């Protein structure tokens, strides 16, 4: 056993890798069944959880790298960047209770996922975090962009739903080298609500919508604002009863974020579907399961684990661990006290 680098009741490095691989995609109980199916032996669910969270915590800590704004030229001139939040189920145990099942608080926390890639690339770089606030998400977005090829002479084309925190972080992280475009589909949702109040029938509504889409895509935002202005509701009506006024106010307050003509001319995306999909297959697929509630530090660690795999850093992690780890393993990779909680 010593020559195999395994101690009694321990897990070898290759076995740990298999455990983490299975548990990265499915609940720990199902990972146990997968191990039994493929390797023919039983491992306790608590061991699977401990090994997985230990390595996930290591990956989370490894992702905390300070980053300076690049001074060298970038590998690519145009970088596409997106970030957005999605809710994750979180449980906070009551430290005063001996039985941790009692007194716990359930809530939903926002997991912010970021991605960036060179224009035309189909292999984004991802990042994600729950704790740390919007500043952490912004730094992660910058990190994704730098890894994707952003440099001192690059420009970032950010696309999103117009949330103020995203716009603010694009400005804070990229300054004049960054630009922000509101997702075209998101704008069309405002236009569609207005069209229902303006157009008398389905055919007229469709024609009106197509005219406004064409105006926006060809750089004629003022035409759309004028078309809306002719149908503004009385000021005494509440916003929920005034879709035309709501749409007009939304567009007129974001003129600098609606330059679809320029984006299309530069062959850049006008939609943020990439980040919406990323939330589903990075965060929600593992962290948003029926009946599953996570301690926030464990959710952050599992998010880091899934990001490590999708970014192609999986092999490098295990290779580095093999070089730095001690010969004997005792089911528990070294991890911080916080991530072990």
Regions found by a protein language model. Name each.
Residues 1-341:
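Catalytic center-proximal scaffold of phosphoryl-transfer enzymes
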